[in-house]
């Protein structure tokens, strides 16, 4: 992808940036469970002074049941359709920060819509980091307690090639969330400069 931005492409040491720009499109966070989409998304929205939405929460409210129940009762196709409807609606509401479900970006239609209408940021965690955050948690419908490593290993193998299609990749580490947010802001700023050269940004990074 010509305009793909990976934070590793810059050698500058992350420092706490003063946000003096607005993204030209909604910012959509993608990644597997445990990557920090919700926690980072909320902090990122505060730094940008933008609304924050969790698409999983919106899907559950629209359906009147949990993501796990939608999948088990109505099937994966119904879940994909519901996620596409909700995510497209959120994107069309205007510029905001959106945290998506762990597999949302792996669905072709949803991925295509996000890529056309938003800035996608992949919070990429390695297996060790993801396991540290999700092992033993009961609120992860796609994970079976005791088999987290096996399931996550397979998901990384299957889904990371699709997540690579995101506009921006930021590696999530075992570090304070505020530092990760700083790195996301810097990555978004650099991506905008590269991809939207006519878009005016007051640089304070």
Task: Mark where each language-model region is.
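NTP-dependent small-molecule kinase module
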Residues: 2-22, 43, 47, 93, ...
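Hydrophobic anchor at the beta1->P-loop junction of P-loop NTPases
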Residues: 29
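P-loop (Walker A) phosphate-binding loop of NTP-binding proteins
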Residues: 32
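ATP-binding Walker
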Residues: 35
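Walker A/P-loop
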Residues: 38
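Post-Walker A helix-loop "phosphate-sensing" segment adjacent to the P-loop in P-loop NTPases
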Residues: 46-55
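ATP-dependent small-molecule kinase phosphotransfer cores
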Residues: 54-115, 140
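A glycine- and Lys/Arg-enriched "phosphate-lid" helix/loop adjacent to the NTP-binding pocket
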Residues: 116-161
